[in-house]
Amino acid sequence: MGTHARKKASLLLLVLATVALVSSPGWSFAQGTPATFGPIFEEQPIGLLFPEESAEDQVTLACRARASPPATYRWKMNGTDMNLEPGSRHQLMGGNLVIMSPTKTQDAGVYQCLASNPVGTVVSKEAVLRFGFLQEFSKEERDPVKTHEGWGVMLPCNPPAHYPGLSYRWLLNEFPNFIPTDGRHFVSQTTGNLYIARTNASDLGNYSCLATSHMDFSTKSVFSKFAQLNLAAEDPRLFAPSIKARFPPETYALVGQQVTLECFAFGNPVPRIKWRKVDGSLSPQWATAEPTLQIPSVSFEDEGTYECEAENSKGRDTVQGRIIVQAQPEWLKVISDTEADIGSNLRWGCAAAGKPRPMVRWLRNGEPLASQNRVEVLAGDLRFSKLSLEDSGMYQCVAENKHGTIYASAELAVQALAPDFRQNPVRRLIPAARGGEISILCQPRAAPKATILWSKGTEILGNSTRVTVTSDGTLIIRNISRSDEGKYTCFAENFMGKANSTGILSVRDATKITLAPSSADINVGDNLTLQCHASHDPTMDLTFTWTLDDFPIDFDKPGGHYRRASAKETIGDLTILNAHVRHGGKYTCMAQTVVDGTSKEATVLVRGPPGPPGGVVVRDIGDTTVQLSWSRGFDNHSPIAKYTLQARTPPSGKWKQVRTNPVNIEGNAETAQVLGLMPWMDYEFRVSASNILGTGEPSGPSSKIRTKEAVPSVAPSGLSGGGGAPGELIINWTPVSREYQNGDGFGYLLSFRRQGSSSWQTARVPGADAQYFVYGNDSIQPYTPFEVKIRSYNRRGDGPESLTALVYSAEEEPRVAPAKVWAKGSSSSEMNVSWEPVLQDMNGILLGYEIRYWKAGDNEAAADRVRTAGLDTSARVTGLNPNTKYHVTVRAYNRAGTGPASPSADAMTVKPPPRRPPGNISWTFSSSSLSLKWDPVVPLRNESTVTGYKMLYQNDLHPTPTLHLTSKNWIEIPVPEDIGHALVQIRTTGPGGDGIPAEVHIVRNGGTSMMVESAAARPAHPGPAFSCMVILMLAGYQKL
C-alpha cells in the first residue's frame, strides 16, 4: 500500500472512531462537556375537559423533555401534523401547545407531542381535549304528582342535555331546604330521580331537581321547575318491598375506579337493604345497609355477581347484577437505554398486562417500525442482526387496548471504539498466595470486542496446565510459585486499533486453617462454640467470615444469636447462643487475606419441637363434623408424639382447640375427624405437632369451608316487652348471633296469648336482625298480661321453643290525681311538698310522682318539673327565688306518662338572709384559745331575721373543718399552741338560710407572736370590699 493510500486509510479510521465516540451516550471529548442523549419526557400532556361556556380564552397542553442537545417540538392532532405558524390560533410556547379561543368543532380531538434532537425522536402519550356543557331545564311547568299516603312514589328529574355526567340533589319548597338522604328518601345519581319508600304528610310540598356539572376548572348547577306532590288521605296499608331503583345486569369498570351500585325499594314498613356477593364473600369494608354499594378502588377480586335484597315484615324483593372488571395496559417489562457494539446482535423485549390483552407495536424516532433486512419485529420482541451505526436512535414500545395506550422509551447507541484501558487498566500490583490461584482481568473498552493476548515480560503466554487465557481475556495462573513473580501485560486489538496495560504479580505465603470446627448435636436453647484458628502471611491482615448453608451470618443483627471471638487475629471462634432449630445446618469458617483464603466445614444438628405440618385439607363436610388430613412436617430430629387440631370462625377470629375422633391423635397419624362444630358456619383449621421437646409452630390455615345447614339448636333469649301505644303488645328479644343461626332464611316464630286463655296466636318475623314485634288490637286493655314464647327457624326447619315469659301490653296514664297536697317554703330557695298516695290501678305500674311549680302570675305552661325516684309522698324542691309565691300541683306517673293534676297548693319562700357579713370583728388571743366578737347583723326589711351565727374553724394540723353554732355575737375558739395557721369563717343563719361569710386568718410567727388577718367576703353584688391586717407581738394579748 502506498503512502497516500495509508494516510487515506488512517484518516478513514479516525473519522469512524470520531463518529462512534459522538454517537455514544455520556461520551465527551473534554472533562465537563455535557453528554449527548436523546429526549426523555419530564412532562406529558394530559386530557382536559373544557367548559363550552368558560370565560377562559385559551387551553394549554403541556410538554417538556430533557435532552442534550435541547429538544425541538412539534404536535399532532388526530394523527396529523399541526400547523404552528406564528399568528395562528395554535401557538408553540417552549414545548407547550396553546390553543387560542378553543371551540368544540375545531379543537376537540386527540393530541400528541413529539420531541426531537440529533439523537432521535420520541412521541408522548395521547391527550384528549373534550368540551363539556350543561343546558338549562325546560321552562314548561311540571305536572303534579299524585299518590296515596303510605304508598311509595318516584319524582322524575328528566335532566337537560349535558356532558359529562351530573350529580343530583332535590329541594323541598325553597332553597336550601334539601331532601335528606335517609332510609325513606333516595336520590339516584344515575338518573337523578327522587324515590320515597313510604310517603307521609311531611312529604307534601313542591319539589325541584338540582343538577350539577363538575368540570376541570368550572362547576355549574341548574334547577328544574317545581313539581307538586299531592297525597290522598288513607289509612296506611302494609305492603311488601318492590325495588324501583335497580342497578344494571352488567356494570363494566376499570381497575382503580370507583364502582357504585344503586338499589332502593318502596314498601311499608320501610324496607331494610342488604347487599351480598353471590359468587364470593363481600369484603367487610364494603358491607352496608345503604341504598348504594360503593367500591372506591375496584380490583379483579371484586369481579362477580352482586345481589341487593330489600326486606320488611311483609316480604322481600331482590335484584342481581354482575360487575365486570377490566384494566388499562400496565408495563410488566420495559426497554432501557442500551449501548451495543457495532456488528453485534441485540434483542429487546417489553410486555404489558391489561384486560383485554394489550397489543404491542414499536416506533423508531416516532415512526412505526416493521420487520425489514436486519430488523425483526415480533409483537413484544425487537431483534437486530449485525448492528450498524444507523441503527442508533430513540425507540418506543407501545402497548394499547381499548382502554388506553402506554409508551416505554429507550435510546440505542451503536458504538465503534478502538481498545482503551484508561477507564479500566490491569491492576498495577497483583498479590497472590503461594500454591494458590490468581485471576487477572483484562477489560479494555472496545467496540467491537477486542482480541486479547498476554505476555510475561517478553514471553507471549499460551494455555497450559497452569496458565489459561479465558474467552473474555482473563489470565488464570494456578499452583503459584515464586517463579511466577514479574510483569504481566495484556494486549488488546480490533479493526479500530490496539492498546496494552501491565501489572506486577507478587507472591505471598498461603493462608491455612490450623484448628477446624467440629460437628455437634445439641437441643433447642443450648449454647455451642465452633472453633476456628488459622495461620497466614504476616505482612497481610487476616479476617474470618462464617456462613450457614452458604449464607453469610450477620453478627450485627440486634438480638442475634451469634457471637465471634475477638481476642487474637488468628482465632475466629463462633458461639451460638440459645440455639433454635433454624440454627442447624452446615457452618463454614473462611480465613481470608486479600490474596487468598481457605475454609473448613462442620455440621450442627439442633433438636427441637416439630415443624409445622403441611397441606391441611378439609373433606367429608357435615353439619357438625369434618374430616381433616395433613402431611407430616419436619420432626426436627425428635419423633413426633401427637397432633393437636384447632379451628377458628369469623365472629371471634381466635383459634380454639376442637374435639376429635380419635381423642388423642398419635404422631404417625395424618387424618382425624373434627367433632362438635356449629352448622352453617365458616371455619378454618390448623394442625400442630408435638414431641418430647415441646409443641411446634402450627400449620398454615386450611382453605375456608362452611359446614352444612341444620335446624336451629338454641332458642332466642332476652324475651321481654311492654310499652308502645294503646291497644299494642310489643314483644322484644335478643337477636340470635350468626354462629347460632345454623342456616339461611333465618327468622323468628312468636306464640302469645292472654294470660288464662287456652288458644295461642302466632306470628312469623323474617330476618336474623329482627328484635321486636308489635301486635295491635283495639280490644287489648291497658297493662294486660300475655304469655309469650319464641323460637327461631331457618330453611331447614324450626328450632326449640323458649320458656314462657310474661309480657304486659301498653300502659295508659294514671287516672287518679294525688289528694291533700301541702306546700310550705322552708328557706329562701326551698320548699317542702307532701301529698297522699295514689292507689295502684290497672293501667300500669306506678313509678312515682311529678311535682309542677310556677310563680304566681305566670302561666302554668311555664311550670318547672321535678320527679320523685320512687313512691315517696313528700319532697323538697330547691332552686327557688326568695320571698316568692309559688303554685304547686302533683301528678302520678307511669311508663305511659303522667296522670291528672291535683288541686294546686300555694307556698311562699322565705326572705333571703342578710347580704352583709358580720363586721367590726375583734378578738382576744391567749395561749390556748381565741375569743372573737363582732357587731350583730341587723336585717333589712326585705331580708329574713337572724337567729344565730355559724362558725367554721380549720387549722393546718386538722384539715377537717369544725362547725360551731352560737346565738350570740361572740364565740371562743380553742387554738392549740403548736398550730402554724388557722382559718375561721363567720356567717349569719336564720329562716332564709345562711348569709355571706367573713374570714379570719391566724398565722403564728414564733413564741406567742401571731398574725391575724380578717377579710370580709366580697358581696355577690358590686360593693366595697374591706380588709385589714394587724401583727401581734405581745407576750400576752392585744385587743384590736
From Swiss-Prot:
Entry annotated with the keyword Lipid biosynthesis: no
Motif Cell attachment site mapped to chain: 796-798
Alphabetically sorted, this entry's keywords are: Cell adhesion, Cell membrane, Disulfide bond, Glycoprotein, GPI-anchor, Immunoglobulin domain, Lipoprotein, Membrane, Repeat, Signal
GO MF annotation: an example: carbohydrate binding
**Lipid (GPI-anchor amidated alanine) linked to which residue positions?**
1015
Coarse class of the protein's main subcellular location: membrane
The segment annotated Disordered runs over 895-921
Localization per Swiss-Prot or TrEMBL: Cell membrane
PROSITE patterns in the record, alphabetically?
FN3, IG_LIKE
Please list the residue ranges annotated as the Ig-like C2-type domain: 39-130, 135-224, 241-324, 329-413, 419-506, 511-605
Q: Which cysteines are joined by disulfide bonds?
A: 63-113, 157-209, 263-308, 350-397
Cellular compartments per GO CC: axon; axon initial segment; cell surface; juxtaparanode region of axon; myelin sheath; neuron projection; neuronal cell body; node of Ranvier
State the Gene Ontology BP annotations: adult walking behavior; axon guidance; axonal fasciculation; axonogenesis; cell-cell adhesion; cell-matrix adhesion; central nervous system myelination; cerebral cortex GABAergic interneuron migration
Prosegment location in residue numbers: 1016-1040
Q: Which InterPro entries match?
A: Contactin-1_2_Ig1, FN3_dom, FN3_sf, Ig-like_dom, Ig-like_dom_sf, Ig-like_fold, Ig_I-set, Ig_sub
Q: Which Pfam families match?
A: fn3, I-set, Ig_3
Lineage: superkingdom? Eukaryota
Q: In which tissues is it expressed?
A: In neural tissues in embryos, and in adult brain, spinal cord and cerebellum.
Please give the residues the UniProt entry marks as glycosylated. Answer: 78, 200, 206, 463, 479, 500, 527, 777, 832, 920, 942
What is the membrane topology noted in the UniProt record heading this document? Answer: Lipid-anchor; GPI-anchor
In UniProt terms, what function does this protein have? May play a role in the initial growth and guidance of axons. May be involved in cell adhesion. In conjunction with another transmembrane protein, CNTNAP2, contributes to the organization of axonal domains at nodes of Ranvier by maintaining voltage-gated potassium channels at the juxtaparanodal region.
To which protein family does this belong?
Belongs to the immunoglobulin superfamily. Contactin family.
Q: Which PANTHER family match?
A: CONTACTIN-2, PROTEIN SIDEKICK
- By what name is this protein known? Contactin-2
Source organism: Rattus norvegicus
Gene symbol of the encoding locus = Cntn2
